[in-house]
């Protein structure tokens, strides 16, 4: 079963980039036939299969019955993820509180969603309660990067370090203890890396 948590394949990323380029250069999305021509597909069904997979993964929205009924989700704004229910994908519909009209390309790499920060464990890194953390979805992470991690259905923002199977999720506040995870015995999912911050202007 395909979920929004699944990463894009190389071909899916190429098709998404083609859709994005067509929208930016021509002001409209491509047709299925144009996608077939661009990628050498023999049948519009091949394009349709890729499009439906992109929709299932949350990259686009398909409008039934329209030749150019393809909308980029990023054009709708970055989704703001609030409370995350146990066992559900990060970008499940019920987790999205709102969408912010922020250009995802302002961040490098491109932001996929915003996460509402809860608590002060990353205070000394400048990340505080109610901030909106811009996150790039990727399971690939390097030591020293600030990550969004899911551990036993709890989501946390911490600095990532690793020694073999032992992962340490480090806070940036002396009032909090590091989280030590032995990945041989505990499931740890990296939901993405922090690529920017939107400060809550209400404070």
UniProtKB/Swiss-Prot annotation:
It catalyses: Hydrolysis of Ala-|-Gly bond in repressor LexA. It holds the Pfam family LexA_DNA_bind. The gene is lexA. Its EC number is 3.4.21.88. The keyword DNA damage applies. GO terms for molecular function: DNA binding; serine-type endopeptidase activity. Homodimer. The record marks 86-87 as: Cleavage. Represses a number of genes involved in the response to DNA damage (SOS response), including recA and lexA. In the presence of single-stranded DNA, RecA interacts with LexA causing an autocatalytic cleavage which disrupts the DNA-binding part of LexA, leading to derepression of the SOS regulon and eventually DNA repair. The active site is at residues 121, 158. GO terms for biological process: DNA repair; DNA replication; negative regulation of DNA-templated transcription; proteolysis; SOS response. Keywords: Autocatalytic cleavage, DNA damage, DNA repair, DNA replication, DNA-binding, Hydrolase, Repressor, SOS response, Transcription, Transcription regulation. Signal peptide: none annotated. This is LexA repressor. Belongs to the peptidase S24 family. The keyword tRNA processing does not apply. It comes from the Bacteria. Residues 32-52 bind DNA. The lineage of its organism: Bacteria, Pseudomonadati, Pseudomonadota, Betaproteobacteria, Rhodocyclales. InterPro entries: LexA (IPR006200), LexA-like (IPR039418), LexA/Signal_pep-like_sf (IPR036286), LexA_DNA-bd_dom (IPR006199), LexA_repressor (IPR050077), Peptidase_S24_LexA (IPR006197), Peptidase_S24_S26A/B/C (IPR015927), WH-like_DNA-bd_sf (IPR036388). Disulfide bonds: none annotated. It comes from Aromatoleum aromaticum (strain DSM 19018 / LMG 30748 / EbN1).
């Amino acid at each position: 079963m395909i979920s929004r948590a699944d990463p894009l394949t190389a071909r899916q990323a190429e098709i998404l980039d083609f859709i994005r380029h067509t929208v930016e250069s021509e002001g409209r999305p491509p047709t299925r036939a144009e996608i077939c021509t661009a990628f050498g597909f023999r049948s519009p069904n091949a394009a349709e299969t890729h499009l439906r997979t992109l929709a299932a993964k949350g990259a686009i929205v398909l409008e039934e019955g329209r030749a150019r009924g393809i909308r980029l989700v990023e054009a709708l704004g970055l989704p703001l993820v609030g409370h995350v229910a146990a066992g559900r994908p990060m970008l499940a519909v019920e987790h999205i509180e709102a969408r912010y009209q922020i250009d995802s390309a302002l961040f490098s790499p491109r932001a996929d969603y915003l996460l509402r920060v809860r608590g002060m464990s990353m205070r000394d890194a400048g990340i505080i309660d109610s901030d909106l953390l811009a996150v790039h979805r990727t399971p690939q992470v390097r030591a020293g990067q600030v990550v969004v991690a899911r551990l036993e259905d709890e989501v946390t923002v911490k600095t990532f370090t690793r020694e073999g199977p032992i992962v340490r999720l480090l806070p940036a506040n002396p009032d909090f203890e590091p989280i030590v995870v032995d990945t041989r015995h505990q499931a740890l999912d990296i939901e993405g890396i922090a690529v920017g911050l939107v400060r809550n202007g209400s404070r």
